[in-house]
């Protein structure tokens, strides 16, 4: 399929490059560094070769979210966004941008989002899970009350917010002791991000801000296939408190969330996701440079789904969600 839009596609700046070192074997690190720092060369050639018209670029993980010092987090977020704006300006026909945000400081994050959207032309934000602040030992999740004004501005700006994974903090990772292979994208990423998304749903956030659009990668971090059970078992809880939100989890999932195919290239999983959340809320992504563009594209181009759904997922859903036809 030609003309695809891909939207979980990462880059790095020198200050955040090392954050990605632990996710690949040592003998592959040199190649990954090249992939993360390159935008205009290898990346663009692969896009051309595999029918990707547009990439929406975002900073690698955890990057800004793992900088407990507020001032430093604000500085790195702003620098990353400025670098990305310059790169996108070189090829505005091929590259768009997600803002990195210093959510250690909700007011600063709000201001940076406003700057990126209004002044730099970014199409949304991608945030790498919870943020660390102060001593770095307490994760800040975005259902907390201090983030409500931030979410109000996201809704006002009418841009999507991509909740990208990161590993849990060491003190919250004891279940993985002795099993480090379960950390990262193998399992811990999905578990951490799914719980964060459920917290957002349960908090009442989407009752207060019903026009928010949240994106989850990796075919929804396992949530599409658990929504029925989550609501079914929660309904058995007869005694208050249950949760502050007014509706079922599945209602928020189906109305406020979108999912991407990033790093999850399995047809059975895609078909189940279509049955659960609908083809209108699924978007193509590759997860470059941690996955290969040819693998993602070859699978998607050949996967056994309706051609109308392929066009939606590969292109038109993203163009609608990010309002690309008016750019």
From Swiss-Prot:
Transmembrane segments: none annotated. Zn(2+) binds at residues 8, 10, 164, 287. Changing residue 164 to Q: Loss of both decarboxylation and carboxylation activities. Its cofactor is Zn(2+). It catalyses: 2,6-dihydroxybenzoate + H(+) = resorcinol + CO2; 2,3-dihydroxybenzoate + H(+) = catechol + CO2. Binds 1 Zn(2+) ion per subunit. GO terms for molecular function: carboxy-lyase activity; hydrolase activity; metal ion binding. The active site is at 287. Insensitive to oxygen. Decarboxylation and carboxylation are inhibited by AgNO(3) and by diethyl pyrocarbonate, a histidine residue-specific inhibitor. Decarboxylation is also inhibited by HgCl(2) and activated by MgCl(2). Pathway: Aromatic compound metabolism. One of its GO terms (cellular component) is cytosol. GO terms for biological process: secondary metabolic process. InterPro entries: ACMSD (IPR032465), Amidohydro-rel (IPR006680), Metal_Hydrolase (IPR032466). Its EC number is 4.1.1.103. It is an enzyme of class 4 (lyase). Optimum pH is 7.0 for decarboxylation. Belongs to the metallo-dependent hydrolases superfamily. ACMSD family. PANTHER family: 2-AMINO-3-CARBOXYLMUCONATE-6-SEMIALDEHYDE DECARBOXYLASE (PTHR21240), AMIDOHYDROLASE FAMILY PROTEIN (AFU_ORTHOLOGUE AFUA_7G05840) (PTHR21240:SF31). Homotetramer. Involved in the gamma-resorcylate (2,6-dihydroxybenzoate) catabolism. Catalyzes the reversible decarboxylation of gamma-resorcylate to resorcinol. Also catalyzes the decarboxylation of 2,3-dihydroxybenzoate to catechol, but does not act on 2-hydroxybenzoic acid 3-hydroxybenzoic acid, 4-hydroxybenzoic acid, 3,4-dihydroxybenzoic acid, 2,5-dihydroxybenzoic acid, 2,3,4-trihydroxybenzoic acid, 3,4,5-trihydroxybenzoic acid, 4-aminobenzoic acid, o-hydroxyphenylacetic acid and vanillic acid. Resorcinol and catechol can both be carboxylated by the reverse reaction. This is Gamma-resorcylate decarboxylase. It comes from Rhizobium radiobacter. The gene is rdc.
